[in-house]
């Protein structure tokens, strides 16, 4: 059995909890010297100590996995293309603060603040795309609403009773899905929205009104004002998704249906994209779903949404890999396309992808089209209905990469230009 060292993770946990080694050792029921050896990677992490850590601090065992470090190592490889992978992995594992500093260097050298959208993306990634207090608050909010047929009127009643906001349905045909006016004390919803979309929009505004302090508490560490504003918006959307698809219910549905996205979507009235994105956030300690990668892209390969609870690394420059199944999804509208792929580091993933369309538009105008993909490590694939009939062995997997500019597969027939 491979020995697993988690010194950096244990040290980070202890620092976040504000504990000395003596305090933490006492909580875990181990000696201070043993904890010191664990933190300095002089001793491997045993199953017994792992269980103690997860139980005492309410963590899932995946917190101590190497997935996060492998993803960071991939990001460092883009900035330091000549550095050995083993050394980058060591930096990501042993010196996370140094790794973050290296990642921040391009923006610092440019003398300008980082792109606020990238700041927010990294913010969600650092939280493993899961916010426990928001998720549980959303579940508590959704539970009394009961059946889907009644939840819209009940949310509207809560907004009116508790905050004096009137909900006006089918108020406009274009623009944003919803708008709130604090002066008029009303929330206006665009026409043509599905029941689940209306539930999402009302829950979004409820989060901003009822849980503003909680949103601020999460977003306050972000220095960039624009990024902080975007993070607050994203956190309210997170709450809305969690209220529309409550954690316990969607996890139960996912396990029961073997993660059949269409069946789950039918239960909650949600679209394929929304369901996939919510599945990618189910990382509650003690009740985790499969760790997923979620991505949305257009025909040109521009990634407009991305989140990962795995080691999968997205390239920060250039396009996406042309051999990736997400591009084939545009060829088969309204059908799920599957792929087993292997990355240059040897990790094998199973992917499901599908084209999704925006709302209907007038004749002659282009309709928004994207492809969304949901992927997981092949080790979890047999838990999904999409693995049935697929050969999951690495030998039969399609070799893909992070993108041509940083991909080490020099002999790839689809390479668009040489690697940096």
Where are the regions a protein language model picked out?
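Short, conserved structural micro-motifs that define repeat-unit consensus positions
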Residues: 7-10, 20-21
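Residues within helix-turn-helix
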Residues: 22, 33
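Short juxta-domain linker segments that transition from a proline/glycine-rich
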Residues: 2-5, 12-15, 26, 30, ...
